[in-house]
Curated annotation (Swiss-Prot):
Annotated compartments: Membrane
Regions that span the bilayer: 3-23, 431-451, 481-501, 527-547, 572-592, 599-619
Membrane recorded as keyword: yes
Annotated Pfam families: Ig_TMM62, Metallophos, TMEM62_C
Recorded topology in the membrane: Multi-pass membrane protein
One GO CC annotation: membrane
Lineage, broadest ranks: Eukaryota, Metazoa, Chordata, Craniata, Vertebrata
Protein name: Transmembrane protein 62
Keyword set, alphabetical order: Glycoprotein, Membrane, Transmembrane, Transmembrane helix
An example Gene Ontology molecular-function term: hydrolase activity
CDD domains: MPP_TMEM62_N
Glycan-carrying positions: 180, 467, 626
Chief subcellular location: membrane
The keyword Ribonucleoprotein appears for this protein: no
Amino acid sequence: MAAVLALRVVAGLAAAALVAMLLEHYGLAGQPSPLPRPAPPRRPHPAPGPGDSNIFWGLQISDIHLSRFRDPGRAVDLEKFCSETIDIIQPALVLATGDLTDAKTKEQLGSRQHEVEWQTYQGILKKTRVMEKTKWLDIKGNHDAFNIPSLDSIKNYYRKYSAVRRDGSFHYVHSTPFGNYSFICVDATVNPGPKRPYNFFGILDKKKMEELLLLAKESSRSNHTIWFGHFTTSTILSPSPGIRSIMSSAIAYLCGHLHTLGGLMPVLHTRHFQGTLELEVGDWKDNRRYRIFAFDHDLFSFADLIFGKWPVVLITNPKSLLYSCGEHEPLERLLHSTHIRVLAFSLSSITSVTVKIDGVHLGQAVHVSGPIFVLKWNPRNYSSGTHNIEVIVQDSAGRSKSVHHIFSVQENNHLSFDPLASFILRTDHYIMARVLFVLIVLSQLTILIIFRYRGYPELKEPSGFINLTSFSLHVLSKINIFYYSVLLLTLYTVLGPWFFGEIIDGKFGCCFSFGIFVNGHFLQGSITFIIGILQLAFFNIPLMAYMCWSLLQRCFGHNFRSHLHQRKYLKIMPVHLLMLLLYIWQVYSCYFLYATYGTLAFLFSPLRTWLTLLTPVLIRYVWTLNSTKFGIFMVQLKSHLSS
């Protein structure tokens, strides 16, 4: 009965925790409503034609990571980008979406704002006069906010050396003869900014959300709105209704931050349920990626590019079906268009722009002005199904570039985004991590409590893996020193401070699983839950399993020396080696804590340093505990084996 009662209590706690998290995230009432989005009126004209009007283009660059210690080529290539690339493409504006500097220490573990990195960045902007050529909108990323106690701190070099030089979200309007286009910056950087890795997620509090809601309302009269920020929406903590809801009237959200997951996901694009595109651009740091985007007769197109690769080609009409959305743009203009339209740029003059549809040669596009090339077509010839358009551009130096995409002149056709990319960008990872963390903890506690209050085991069936595992859990749970050690470790991982130290240089604080207290502020937990999951999965639970296995060996009548002489090395040694590797991982986590947060954090870290020191003591106690403590278990096991 006690075991059933304990199970019900734990299950009830788990259900309550899940419901609380869902209510906190989605809310029930009293939250600001997202902007209303009435059905857009039909606007077939002006349709894309032979002229050079109703079009402008811009660039996005992200995660530059200028470093005083690593890869000086980042700065060299950025200077070339700000001179050569900008001069050739001549964008109306450039969005530099965060992590302008690296802000790491020499060994790449710690974090510190280096003024010389910011001076290098500003020096490039001034030397190339890029701010005289285009509107350069640079915003902060999490690296630009590392180790900054407040926005007014002298360490906040963004205020001194950037082009924008102002903290917080803002609204920039690009005015043209054919309408206004809004660009809204989302500043989700953490204030105060802790050292790495505890500011990987961005945070928008209620005040920031209200500011963004006002900016969204300001942009309602613009032809189009693009939101841009450093963090993906999946790595931003925001109260209900959530950042995605507030930006739902925008055609796209342009961001960086994830570095294409180290190259594992070179294309991180998706569409949210409200219709807004989310487009993460690859990093400049290692991959020298950037993006060109354009509005052509209010149809949005873009292409992700590699620096130094020419020609640069963007098909603006017909636009890609994958990135089309009738709720946000006048797709009917495609059906009424008279010309295929292409933007083509290169170091040398463009000599030919060849167009093919479904593999059929359609002709050579004619140069209109600047980078604009057009070719007359009849879209009604392609009124059914989907079609593939290919454009091949050559310049006078012999360079060639071929681009293609699928299009449709029917508005009811759709293509699906990569499911993994959609999962990465559309999932609130801090909520998933929080739920998973709670479930792991509750599962471990449930097992401990059930075996604690169940009766002594009766081994009736053959001693297979499951029976012996159950038996060892009984042993662990019914010997007080081991039961309370594991119980305390699990509860402490959830509730106790992991370490105390300088969260920011000169500012002391405590780190918990649910967040960080520093300098009078509370930073809500996000990456802390992921670190907590790693701690549970790679040390706490394996330690519990290793103790169970060792206690089982004791019940067989062995001590540490005798169990090594069983001549079962292939079964015994892998267990010890695996635990040794996990212990080394725990030791490394102590070193990482020392390198990132200093000596004080290293010394006052119960979950890292203290646990690392106490683990050998606990394991030694397992192997040296008086055999009389195992009396009833040894008798029962030997009786079962003999029978």
